[in-house]
């Protein structure tokens, strides 16, 4: 209890809703997971008391960690980010990578060569007979955008205050100069709010899962916005078995899937 009171600056009551969900996020984006005896009301968790177990996760930003995959996730013609889903088990760097992608898209940065040693070559095959016109248009579009990620307005729904690490409404992490943040807001409601009020070109959310999240994603995509999202899983096979998400994947709304692991440390890109 003393540790929690210290982390919450003696205002533990202000974190009641977060604690009910099993965590609290403190200044700097650091998250403290809590466990103990749950108190139920009408079959739902009302509170956790006493809290007897803690798990502290320290947040840290890695500027530039998304540079290795940004060209793969960028449309070469428009410079826009593609609809992307980051897949990783806990503690494998998906939120860190998402945060840097948000910063990159918001500020706009030059892309890298498409060839990559991460998962093999991502070079487009050379145009064969009958494809000269299409190849020529692609070259012209690449020249037009100069291989850059175009700066775009980004709306972030930061339900657990881990992406932007807002303190008194101000992001403590660098999420770009064109980014608007809804802090401590449920994902599904937040996505709808951003579309209606902030006119984002890209919407970013962490750890999607529930049916409400997926319905909100459909709405956002149908409005013409791009999506950057993450989900827990070890592989594509894992997430295809998740209820609700499997049918969503069959709609082929995401253009890129990035699987992360920790084979060579957190944030290792296993497949794209």
Give residue ranges: language-model regions.
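P-loop NTP-binding catalytic core
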Residues: 12-80
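Hydrophobic anchor at the beta1->P-loop junction of P-loop NTPases
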Residues: 86
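Conserved lysine of the Walker
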Residues: 94
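Hydrophobic positions on the alpha1 helix immediately C-terminal to the Walker A/P-loop
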Residues: 97, 101
């Amino acid at each position: 209890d003393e540790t929690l009171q210290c982390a919450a600056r003696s205002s533990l009551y202000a974190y009641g809703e977060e604690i009910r969900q099993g965590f609290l996020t403190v200044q700097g984006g650091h998250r403290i997971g809590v466990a103990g005896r749950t108190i139920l009301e009408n079959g739902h968790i009302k509170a956790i008391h006493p809290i007897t177990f803690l798990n502290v996760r320290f947040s840290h930003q890695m500027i530039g960690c998304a540079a290795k995959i940004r060209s793969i996730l960028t449309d070469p013609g428009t410079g826009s980010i593609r609809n992307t889903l980051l897949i990783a088990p806990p503690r494998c760097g998906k939120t860190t990578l998402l945060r840097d992608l948000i910063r990159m898209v918001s500020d706009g940065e030059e892309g890298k060569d498409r060839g990559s040693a991460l998962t093999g070559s991502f070079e487009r095959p050379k145009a064969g007979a009958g494809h000269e016109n299409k190849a020529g248009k692609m070259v012209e579009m690449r020249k037009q955008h100069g291989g850059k990620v175009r700066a775009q307005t980004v709306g972030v729904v930061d339900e657990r205050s881990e992406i932007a690490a807002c303190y008194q409404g101000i992001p403590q992490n660098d999420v770009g100069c064109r980014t608007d943040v809804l802090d401590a807001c449920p994902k599904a409601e937040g996505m709808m709010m951003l579309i209606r009020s902030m006119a984002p070109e890209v919407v970013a959310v962490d750890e999607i899962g529930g049916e409400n999240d997926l319905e909100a994603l459909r709405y956002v995509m149908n409005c013409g916005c791009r999506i950057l999202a993450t989900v827990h899983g070890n592989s594509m096979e894992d997430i295809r078995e998740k209820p609700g998400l499997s049918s969503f994947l069959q709609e082929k709304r995401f253009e890129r899937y990035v699987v992360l692991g920790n084979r060579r440390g957190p944030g290792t890109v296993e497949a794209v």
